[in-house]
């Protein structure tokens, strides 16, 4: 039998309770574990409903406050998920653990069933993926997937559809592989999804991805400022791994086919554009200006400084972002306020550029642009690593980080699209 875990903070109580009831009623589930960040209103609501849910389903509903497992980073999502892993590993009668965000309005029993069916085929990890708005998942596309393309282009990492997704199933083998790794236990913040995904592949686990056609309907953020901490922590997690090697041709990766995207998803805007436009004009310091001038492409530096005076985003195209990403991998310093704000501003510029150039042309055009960016970046990085391998003694497993300083120093010829240089 399986355990289903819902990590939570303060959420819509009715949604959380409904999801707990749904999971508890599933025939493959024996225990529902609710891991709370704190004992607030949501905790009290689950506690009040627990007796009736247990009585009606015959299943155990466990409430557990997340423990401080990582000690060097901010306590957040990572501590919550790792608290659940520790509980699962201590209860050997449980064979699989599912994770689902507690605020998902569209959650249903089918999510559990689809994951269980793939695990029955001896996959160690089953991840859920969804149709997403063309302006949603901007950290996934521009931070995680690009990082995987640049650093490990010949592995399956660039091709995992939603590597930051919090909806997944782990077998006991996979849970042990993750929790016994000190890097996982130390990643107490938003970077935990990056670590889970990376280590699953590094350790050769067998991975399946199942498609949820109705999408993940949950609370959206208002402006991109709300995502600043997540952005910094996800990028920092990627940077911490840049010298790691990943064996090639180990493990398997299978994906379920997609379905037509619902119109509601196609029409949704993932963030407040008007609020976001103001972000490039605020919180500037001389330190940020100095870092920008010292380390980055002059075209990007000029464009971002112009954006501090008036709305402009044409400078932050795909080439500019990839070049900036390489520089950030080498020089970014987590905890330095100027570096963190500069990372945020460059990323905001990229998101606005994508929105105005591609999303306004329609959903299909926007998704095609995102997928093309990943495909081209992966291919170019793979060719670069192939060239480097011919002159390097490491021939099995690699990290591309040794090429970063050289590439970061190369200046590209800027091709400005006049239509988007507003």
Curated annotation (Swiss-Prot):
Q: How does activity depend on temperature?
A: Optimum temperature is 50 degrees Celsius.
Q: Which GO terms describe its biological process?
A: mannosylglycerate biosynthetic process
Could you say which EC number(s) this protein's record lists? 2.4.1.269
InterPro entries hit by this protein: MGS_C (IPR054143), MGS_GT (IPR054145), Nucleotide-diphossugar_trans (IPR029044)
Return the Pfam families for the record. Answer: MGS_C (PF21967), MGS_GT (PF21969)
GO MF term list: mannosylglycerate synthase activity
List keywords of the entry alphabetically. Answer: Glycosyltransferase, Transferase
Q: What does this gene product do?
A: Involved in the biosynthesis of the compatible solute alpha-D-mannosyl-glycerate (MG). Catalyzes the condensation of GDP-alpha-D-mannose (GDP-Man) with D-glycerate to produce alpha-D-mannosyl-glycerate. Can also use GDP-alpha-D-glucose (GDP-Glc) as sugar donor to produce alpha-D-glucopyranosyl-glycerate (GG).
Q: Under what name is this protein listed?
A: Mannosylglycerate synthase
Instruction: Name the gene that codes for it.
Output: MGS
């Amino acid at each position: 039998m399986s355990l289903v875990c819902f990590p939570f903070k303060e959420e819509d109580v009715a949604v959380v309770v409904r999801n707990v009831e749904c999971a508890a009623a599933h025939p493959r589930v024996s225990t529902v574990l609710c891991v709370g960040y704190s004992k607030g209103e949501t905790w009290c609501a689950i506690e009040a409903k627990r007796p009736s849910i247990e009585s009606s389903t015959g299943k155990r509903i466990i409430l557990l406050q997340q423990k401080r497992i990582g000690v060097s980073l901010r306590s957040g999502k990572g501590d919550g998920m790792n608290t659940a892993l520790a509980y699962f590993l201590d209860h050997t009668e449980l064979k699989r653990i599912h994770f689902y965000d507690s605020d998902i309005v569209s959650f249903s029993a089918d999510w559990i069933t689809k994951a269980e069916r793939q695990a029955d085929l001896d996959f160690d990890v089953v991840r859920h993926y969804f149709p997403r708005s063309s302006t949603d998942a901007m950290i996934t596309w521009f931070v995680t997937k690009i990082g995987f393309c640049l650093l490990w282009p010949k592995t399956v990492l660039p091709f995992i559809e939603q590597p930051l997704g919090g909806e997944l199933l782990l077998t006991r083998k996979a849970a042990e592989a993750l929790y016994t790794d000190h890097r996982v236990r130390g990643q107490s913040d938003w970077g935990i999804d990056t670590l889970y995904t990376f280590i699953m592949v590094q350790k050769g686990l067998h991975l399946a991805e199942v498609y949820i056609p109705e999408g993940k309907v949950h609370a959206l953020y208002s402006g991109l400022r709300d995502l600043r901490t997540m952005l910094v922590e996800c990028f920092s997690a990627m940077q911490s791994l840049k010298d790691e090697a990943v064996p090639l041709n180990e493990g398997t990766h299978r994906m379920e086919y997609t379905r037509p995207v619902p119109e509601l998803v196609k029409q949704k805007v993932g963030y407040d554009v008007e609020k976001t436009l103001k972000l490039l004009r605020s919180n500037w310091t001389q330190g940020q200006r100095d870092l920008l001038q010292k380390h980055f492409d002059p075209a990007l530096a000029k464009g971002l400084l112009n954006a501090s005076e008036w709305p402009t985003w044409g400078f932050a195209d795909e080439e500019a972002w990839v070049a900036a990403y390489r520089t950030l991998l080498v020089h970014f310093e987590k905890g330095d306020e100027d570096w963190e704000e500069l990372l945020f501003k460059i990323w905001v510029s990229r998101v606005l550029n994508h929105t105005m150039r591609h999303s306004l042309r329609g959903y299909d055009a926007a998704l095609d642009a995102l997928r093309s960016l990943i495909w081209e970046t992966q291919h170019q990085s793979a060719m670069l690593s192939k060239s480097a391998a011919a002159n390097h003694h490491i021939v099995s497993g690699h990290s591309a980080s040794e090429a970063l300083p050289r590439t970061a120093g190369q200046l590209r010829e800027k091709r400005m699209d006049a239509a988007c240089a507003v």
